[in-house]
Amino acid sequence: MAIYSAQAPNSILEEEARFEAEVSETQAWWNSTDLFRLTRRPYTARDVVRLRGSMRQSYASNEMAKKLWRTLKTHQANKTASRTFGALDPVQVSMMAKYLDSIYVSGWQCSSTHTTTNEPGPDLADYPYDTVPNKVEHLFFAQQFHDRKQKEARMSMTREERSKTPYIDYLKPIIADGDTGFGGATATVKLCKLFVERGAAGVHIEDQASVTKKCGHMAGKVLVSVGEHVNRMVAARLQFDIMGVETLLVARTDAVAATLIQTNVDARDHQFILGATNPNLKGKPLADVLARAMASGKSGADLQAVEDEWMAMADLKLFSDCVVDGIKALNVSEQEKGRRLGEWMQQTGGNTGNVLSYYQAKELAEKLGISNLFWDWDLPRTREGFYRFQGSVKAAIVRGWAFGPHADIIWMETSSPDMVECRDFALGVKSKHPEIMLAYNLSPSFNWDASRMTDEQMKNFIPEIARLGYCWQFITLAGFHADALVIDTFAKDFAQRGMLAYVEKIQRQEMMNGVDTLAHQKWSGANYYDQLLKTVQGGISATAAMAKGVTEDQFEETQSSTLALESNIGAGTVLAKSRM
């Protein structure tokens, strides 16, 4: 990267020379980095350098971002997937490191378990915007600590001992939940700055409206326009460029299940906005009808009944569907109807990539003989002013096309684990962006048993969609659910059977499965800090935590033998091995 200096320039010419050198190096960075090969920026390297400070800062998260890119591109090339889940705490993230190659930090989990105000709640993104970055830092510090601890332990071993001790890569890249960016462009750049500083290798941002944000599997989702979300992506990328980092950007769309959209300003959204088709409602917008009903004293179920009656009368449809119905009703030959329908579909069909505005589509409809069509997208607007939106995979594809040049990974949120939806979205997006990486939420909000999959199909779901290009797949809340399941079942058992429940369900299981928290003092770093104290005090310490007398010696084993515990359980005997 460019030359930075905390020393003030000695002259205007030196100031300009530094600036130009930094611009050249920034452009060279973009040109030489594979991550940016397909990235579209509406700004220049000169714009970026103008927004930077004079003192260069380096970020550990940048190395993790490069590692994440290599990991995901390898999976993409092999048609496999990095599979992971939402980590709640340092215990989970250290256990996950043994088996998984990326880590997810969920806004839902943070909202319910770890906000910076300590006030829990549902996933509405109404917590302070440093909540998820703080959780990222919590986990990233833990990753670095366990890495340091392992290095000290391994370098205290002989070469033979190290050869028999598996090396664990604790530094697994973290992808974090950026929700909607938490407001306008300035909020998004500040959020992204926090993520880089706290250790995130990647960040995802979704296309819901910030003020009405919902969990992707709740009702009532309101989309922003395509253009507004593109601006969020650009703002995030700009902040990463200012900081000189290669943090991965994931664009998420909730367009499959969304029912509302903030505005009709973007032509790319027009084909999915619903309008009233009943001319008898002309001059009777829903918002006015509801306002009069409220003024007359109606509320609750009575008010809902008024809305339901109006919506039934309105007969909401897409403009395209109205045109198709109109062509079918024309007093022309069937052959001519077929020709006009074909022309309409050819020029408006999403599969061709054509995106007509409502006004262009209306002009085309008139050329095809549909001139007196009643269709009004303003009449059914909600009291908040939102337009009615018909969510679909097609809508998600159109958004994927728009987001692709500005993001590294595209994620379509879905309402069920549907292989057909996965295939259609992948093929649709890749028709314009063949090299784009895709992500998939293996959501615990799905009732997987209700999906009618066999156990074998569930087992193969991840590799099946990986072959379609979904190279990063994650269970958002698995850490939360695993934590709840273990604690609920253990607490119930402990209340009934006391210490036998702990020994049988926890301690022996840790032994048999080689879980390193069995020796929790060692896991927490007591040996590491003993070594640090000895280093400070010339190699000895009378107050070493792991010296003679520590109860953890009861679990100790040597490299040449294993400790076996023999316990009667009913009529049986269990041999358990402790691996420290």
Swiss-Prot record:
What are the subcellular locations of this protein? Glyoxysome
**What are the recorded Gene Ontology BP terms?**
glyoxylate cycle; tricarboxylic acid cycle
Q: Which family does it belong to?
A: Belongs to the isocitrate lyase/PEP mutase superfamily. Isocitrate lyase family.
Q: Required co-factor?
A: Mg(2+)
Q: Which SUPFAM superfamilies match?
A: Phosphoenolpyruvate/pyruvate domain
Q: Name one GO molecular function term.
A: isocitrate lyase activity
Name the positions where substrate binds.
S106, G107, W108, G216, H217, R252, N441, L442, S443, P444, S445, T476
Q: Which domain of life is it from?
A: Eukaryota
List ligand-binding residues for Mg(2+): D177
UniProt xrefs under Pfam families = ICL
Q: Quaternary state and partners of this protein?
A: Homotetramer.
Organism encoding this protein:
Pinus taeda
**Name of the protein in question:** Isocitrate lyase
Q: Which gene encodes it?
A: ICL 8
Keyword annotations of the record:
Glyoxylate bypass, Glyoxysome, Lyase, Magnesium, Metal-binding, Peroxisome, Tricarboxylic acid cycle
Task: Show the GO cellular component annotation of the record.
Answer: glyoxysome
Instruction: Please explain the role this protein plays, according to its UniProt record.
Output: Involved in storage lipid mobilization during the growth of higher plant seedling.
Q: Where is this motif: Microbody targeting signal?
A: 578-580
Task: Give the reactions, separated by semicolons, that this protein catalyses.
Answer: D-threo-isocitrate = glyoxylate + succinate
The UniProt entry annotates the active site at: C215
Question: Which biological pathway?
Answer: Carbohydrate metabolism; glyoxylate cycle; (S)-malate from isocitrate: step 1/2
Task: State which Enzyme Commission number(s) the record gives.
Answer: 4.1.3.1
Query: What InterPro entries does the annotation carry?
Result: ICL/PEPM, Isocitrate_lyase, Isocitrate_lyase_ph_CS, Pyrv/PenolPyrv_kinase-like_dom, Pyrv_kinase-like_dom_sf
